[in-house]
Amino acid sequence: MSLQKSNKITPFLTFDRQKWAELRKSVPLKLTEQDLKPLLGFNEDLSLDEVSTIYLPLARLINYYIEENLKRQTVLHRFLDVASPKVPYIISIAGSVSVGKSTSARILQALLSQWPSERKVDLITTDGFLYPLTTLQEKDLLKRKGFPESYDIHRLIQFVSDIKSGKRHIQAPIYSHLTYDIIPDQYNVVDQPDIVILEGLNVLQSGMNYPSSPHNVFVSDFVDFSIYVDADEDLLKEWYVARFLKFRRSAFSDPNAYFHHYSKLSEQEAIRTASSIWDEINGLNLKQNILPSRERANLILIKGEDHAIQTVKLRK
């Protein structure tokens, strides 16, 4: 058996790092150290060993699911007697602020675009579907940024619905972490790729997170395979504070940065500020909205102290 035994009733198979790595089989590692460097997050130091151990087996699994999905589409279109439109396979990646969702998404994008054949893989972040800064200010939602009510959920649902309808030239708004706002009149265009990776805090959330929404469908209804990147909250807070301190010395020093004023803080002041932001905003959002969605994922990646993934949980 290549999984951990447990008496607890669970819908997941649980693998330790070594057992999961064995499932790579013969999947080739085509990434080099040079390829990996631009994929890493601002505060992460991830090795090629992590790619081989965790992400290559995951790429192999996802490729099996994609093959089965294509077969199901063919059966449905044959039954309906209609031409088969090109419908992208949607992978969602959820998890807390500072857990490393973006890095996981970029690594998967690189791997899935290279093997077993060349594919077009688009990566979209749901940050682009946040309300503009002026709207958040008008709604008094600046301290709720990242919470469900801070997103234009209707626009996001329409976006993923259009992808699954096989539509072409679909526009996704672009978010700037420098200005802390949507960039006006700039878009990423999704034009029938083979795979779309949708990364964000809210991609696993459902009706309970949007009680006032008139929709009876949500982003998760359009997703083919969902991933949740997990870690203990103490680690998440530690990583958030460390990232904040690095930003204070780099991105925040740009006079155009929304958080430029933080660059003038002393290190102790910056630590207190980052801790307060975590406790009042990010940690609260994690407990109320993000963590409760974890068990809906098809796969959970659990990180340890060094950002390395120690445990993988796969839905049966």
Curated annotation (Swiss-Prot):
It is found in: Cytoplasm. Pathway: Cofactor biosynthesis; coenzyme A biosynthesis; CoA from (R)-pantothenate: step 1/5. Keywords: ATP-binding, Coenzyme A biosynthesis, Cytoplasm, Kinase, Nucleotide-binding, Transferase. GO terms for cellular component: cytoplasm. SUPFAM superfamilies: P-loop containing nucleoside triphosphate hydrolases. Gene3D superfamilies: P-loop containing nucleotide triphosphate hydrolases. Its EC number is 2.7.1.33. One of its GO terms (biological process) is coenzyme A biosynthetic process. It catalyses: (R)-pantothenate + ATP = (R)-4'-phosphopantothenate + ADP + H(+). ATP binds at G95, S96, V97, S98, V99, G100, K101, S102. InterPro entries: P-loop_NTPase, PanK, PRK/URK. One of its GO terms (molecular function) is ATP binding. The keyword Acetylation does not apply. NCBIfam families: panK_bact (TIGR00554). Belongs to the prokaryotic pantothenate kinase family. HAMAP family: Pantothen_kinase_1 (MF_00215). This is Pantothenate kinase. It comes from Actinobacillus pleuropneumoniae serotype 5b (strain L20). The gene is coaA.
